[in-house]
UniProtKB/Swiss-Prot annotation:
This is Cytochrome b6. Binds 2 heme b groups non-covalently with two histidine residues as axial ligands. It is found in: Plastid, Chloroplast thylakoid membrane. GO terms for biological process: photosynthesis; respiratory electron transport chain. It comes from Tupiella akineta. It holds the Pfam family Cytochrome_B. Signal peptide: none annotated. The keyword Hydrolase does not apply. It comes from the Eukaryota. GO terms for molecular function: electron transporter, transferring electrons within cytochrome b6/f complex of photosystem II activity; metal ion binding; oxidoreductase activity. Component of the cytochrome b6-f complex, which mediates electron transfer between photosystem II (PSII) and photosystem I (PSI), cyclic electron flow around PSI, and state transitions. Belongs to the cytochrome b family. PetB subfamily. The gene is petB. It is a multi-pass membrane protein. Heme b 2 binds at residues 86, 187.
């Protein structure tokens, strides 16, 4: 085993990477509330894992969406548990994200030189809420359908461009298959990709600048 390790160590400098990760300075004022960002990240990983598992059974069509969710809940082994964990962790992720934003704001973690870290965090917060809005509609039951109709109808109040935004969100004048396809694409591809990109930037800046000091 030592020869295998030495082979990788010679090429990748694994020990140097491990030392850099393990020797990062942690200020003495850090408490349990500074773990909220990590908790949010952990819940995001749970969302990815359970969401990926559900894509094997979910069918994003207005005719089959509800039936596929019902099949997952009643016939698939542990399907009810996977969906329940997805739903519970989604609620917990939103809560931990809100608490994390509040902690950063109240402790002044958004101030110079960490403005970009704050901006990427706010963008991820918007993505998190968008996850909830798009995911809520995917079962395409009565609650999901009317939620989509109301949410996508809100921009209609904007002068001039409002109707165009509504049509863009819905994929047409009314709510239907195009709307479900758009929301499914946003929920499973666009939003996860954006979140991962800004999350990497967020983490890199935290590693570079460290944790902000006490007030």
């Amino acid at each position: 085993m030592s020869k295998i390790y030495d082979w990788f160590e010679e090429r990748l400098e694994i020990q140097a990477i491990a030392d850099d990760i393990s020797s990062k300075y942690v200020p003495p004022h850090v408490n349990i509330f500074y773990c909220l960002g990590g908790i949010t990240f952990t819940l995001f990983l749970v969302q990815v894992a359970t969401g990926f598992a559900m894509t094997f059974y979910y069918r994003p069509t207005v005719a089959e969406a509800f039936a596929s969710v019902n099949y997952l809940m009643t016939d698939v082994n542990f399907g009810w548990l996977i969906r329940s964990i997805h739903r519970w962790s989604a609620s917990m992720m939103v809560l931990s994200m809100i608490l994390h934003v509040c902690r950063v704001y109240l402790t002044g973690g958004f101030k110079r030189p960490r403005e970009l870290t704050w901006i990427t965090g706010v963008i991820m917060a918007v993505c998190t809420v968008s996850f909830g809005v798009t995911g809520y509609s995917l079962p395409w039951d009565q609650v999901g359908y009317w939620a989509v109709k109301i949410v996508t109808g809100v921009p209609d109040a904007i002068p001039v461009v409002g109707p165009a935004i509504v049509e863009l969100l819905r994929g047409g004048v009314g709510v239907g298959q195009s709307t479900l396809t758009r929301f499914y694409s946003l929920h499973t591809f666009v939003l996860p990709l954006l979140t991962v990109v800004f999350m990497l930037a967020h983490f890199l800046m935290i590693r570079k600048q460290g944790i902000s000091g006490p007030l």
